[in-house]
Amino acid sequence: MTQVFQGRSFLAEKDFSREEFEYLIDFSAHLKDLKKRGVPHHYLEGKNIALLFEKTSTRTRAAFTTAAIDLGAHPEYLGANDIQLGKKESTEDTAKVLGRMFDGIEFRGFSQRMVEELAEFSGVPVWNGLTDEWHPTQMLADYLTIKENFGKLEGITLVYCGDGRNNVANSLLVAGTLMGVNVHIFSPKELFPAEEIVKLAEEYAKESGAHVLVTDNVDEAVKGADVFYTDVWVSMGEEDKFKERVELLQPYQVNMELIKKANNDNLIFLHCLPAFHDTNTVYGKDVAEKFGVKEMEVTDEVFRSKYARHFDQAENRMHTIKAVMAATLGNLFIPKV
């Protein structure tokens, strides 16, 4: 019997059905429970995992490393200075070599096409740790965190505030509407999501009963909010746009005034991290000195408030990544979902 996940890559949310995505979230919760109870789950005993990183990372690298070790696998980190992808060696050739040596490959970098080529030519499961277009492993952690807090996903309303064109916004739109979550993008018109992403989300919403809203009107955006979500105003590779983004996105900051507008004491705040909520970073100090802004996408008050769930969310990166690796590489009996 064909197994649902075995041998598959995890490249973008749109590659999976609602049932498959929800299964991975529930499987993540199961693995989290095993971890908390100290029950071994070495589904990948003897496997070797390549971790390819063009972009720097704290959570993704730590999550893949600890998840692989918990599963009994050996993770091998290959940073930007260790791999030749497209420079001295084509992605196709690199993929064919790594596929002979490793049982699975994680890639975190810029190009979605590159992670797709790794999957096409390596012959082993490839997992997208982040590209400029999509962030699917983040979505499993995000929606697991939401389900842990509300007991469900369908009918929940998530409001994303900030740069509506980035990979996290794309993924929240598609993954959310796939599973019946209402997704509001609160963003300036200049940073609205790409039309094809919104169209895809609207197609999913028709099937799941969710709705999509893209607006720069704060009152429309916060209506019915259960979850506020934000991300950095400047993505990796866009550091030259700090001034422009700070000025453009200041009205879209998640602060206590915005939280109170939702009139929902049970709402939660999420952030994929890192967050610029104070001046305790080099970036934070630099922005404060140059633009007089001490808090960017979220205020320190909200970041440390009772609404905050971002550290639970960060922990869930590990549990959800573990679920993806185990499901696609562990020869588990998952005949259908």
From Swiss-Prot:
Give the main location.
cytoplasm
What PANTHER family does the record tag this protein with? ORNITHINE CARBAMOYLTRANSFERASE, CATABOLIC, ORNITHINE CARBAMOYLTRANSFERASE, MITOCHONDRIAL
Q: According to the UniProt entry, what is the EC number of this protein?
A: 2.1.3.3
Keyword DNA-binding on this protein?
no
Q: Which residues form a coiled coil?
A: none
From which organism does this entry originate?
Streptococcus agalactiae serotype V (strain ATCC BAA-611 / 2603 V/R)
Q: Which superkingdom? A: Bacteria
Subcellular localization = Cytoplasm
Annotated protein name in UniProt: Ornithine carbamoyltransferase 2, catabolic
Underlying gene: arcB2
